[in-house]
């Protein structure tokens, strides 16, 4: 059996993410993200990469990315219209001590933006 190159690239990217304390996982896309459903009754599975900030007490925030800017679904107006200079990002959420990105891993199979993603998540936590 030959390994699918796409699957291999995803595996390598997820390993790289873990090594830099980004926590990758596949989750059912929350309704508020407006990620298209897989079928009428079934949510799509989407990549969710998050950072844990142990001592943080972050406000609840949910935002979709529209035209490379945050469109607030819930949360403080300070996050409204913030630019997102990353490829393939659907949405961002923040709660308690965690900030995460829902994104299309296919948009960056070479894992070129993991460092930037991590830095962006930390910058949101510091706002």
Which residue stretches match the model-derived regions?
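Membrane-cytosol interface motif
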Residues: 14-29
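Transmembrane-cytosolic junction motif
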Residues: 1-18
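A common structural junction motif
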Residues: 121-126
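Structured extramembrane domains adjacent to transmembrane segments
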Residues: 27-120
């Amino acid at each position: 059996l030959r390994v699918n190159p796409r699957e291999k690239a995803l595996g390598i990217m997820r390993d790289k993410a873990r090594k830099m304390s980004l926590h990758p996982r596949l989750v059912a896309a929350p309704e508020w993200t407006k990620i298209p459903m897989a079928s009428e009754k079934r949510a799509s599975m989407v990549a969710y990469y998050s950072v844990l900030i142990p001592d943080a007490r972050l406000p609840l925030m949910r935002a979709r990315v529209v035209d490379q800017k945050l469109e607030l679904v819930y949360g403080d107006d300070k996050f409204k219209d913030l630019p997102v200079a990353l490829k393939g990002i659907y949405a961002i959420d923040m709660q308690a001590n965690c900030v995460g990105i829902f994104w299309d891993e296919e948009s960056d199979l070479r894992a070129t933006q993991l460092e930037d993603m991590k830095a962006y998540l930390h910058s949101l936590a510091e706002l």
